[in-house]
C-alpha cells in the first residue's frame, strides 16, 4: 500500500455517517479514485457536503470493488473540530487533495515553510 497523489481525481458520494464512503463515480472531466490512486493505495482526500456546512480532510484508503470505496483512515482537519464528520444526507464531493499541513514551500523571502507555519529555514 503506497501513498499516491494524482491530479483531477473527483467523485461523488451519498454516504452518511462517519464510516467508509461508497463512491458513486467520477465527476465529468475527472478520473475515479481507482483510476488515479489505485486499489489498496492511500491518498489525501477532501469531502464536502454540497447541502450542509460539513467538510473533512484526511488520509484514506481506496478499494476497487463492485462499488468502489474510500476508507477514512486519519482525519487531519474538519468542520467537526478536526474529528470525523458524521455526514448528513445529500451529495458529497470527494476529491484528492494535498493538505496545507503536509506541504513544504519557499515563501517570498526564500524561507522554507513546512505546513501552515510561519517559521522556516532561509535557503538564500
Predicted segment positions?
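Elongated alpha-helical scaffolds
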Residues: 53-71
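Glycine-rich, low-complexity segments
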Residues: 1-30, 67, 76-121
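Ser/Thr/Gly-rich low-complexity blocks that favor extended beta-strand/coil architectures
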Residues: 34-59
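Residue-level signal for glycine
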Residues: 52-54, 110, 123
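A generic structural signal for short, solvent-exposed coil/turn residues
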Residues: 13-15, 37, 52, 62, ...
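Functionally constrained cores in energy, signaling, and assembly domains
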Residues: 43, 62, 119
Amino acid at each position: 500500500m503506497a501513498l499516491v497523489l494524482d491530479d483531477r481525481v473527483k467523485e461523488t458520494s451519498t454516504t452518511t455517517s462517519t464510516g467508509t464512503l461508497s463512491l458513486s463515480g467520477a465527476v465529468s472531466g475527472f478520473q475515479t479514485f481507482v483510476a488515479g490512486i489505485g486499489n489498496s493505495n492511500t491518498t489525501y482526500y477532501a469531502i464536502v457536503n454540497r447541502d450542509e456546512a460539513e467538510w473533512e480532510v484526511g488520509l484514506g484508503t481506496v478499494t476497487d470493488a463492485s462499488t468502489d470505496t474510500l476508507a477514512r483512515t486519519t482525519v487531519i482537519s474538519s468542520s467537526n473540530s478536526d474529528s470525523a464528520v458524521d455526514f448528513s444526507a445529500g451529495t458529497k464531493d470527494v476529491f484528492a487533495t494535498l493538505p496545507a499541513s503536509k506541504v513544504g514551500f519557499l515563501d517570498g523571502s526564500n524561507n522554507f515553510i513546512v505546513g501552515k507555519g510561519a517559521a522556516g529555514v532561509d535557503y538564500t
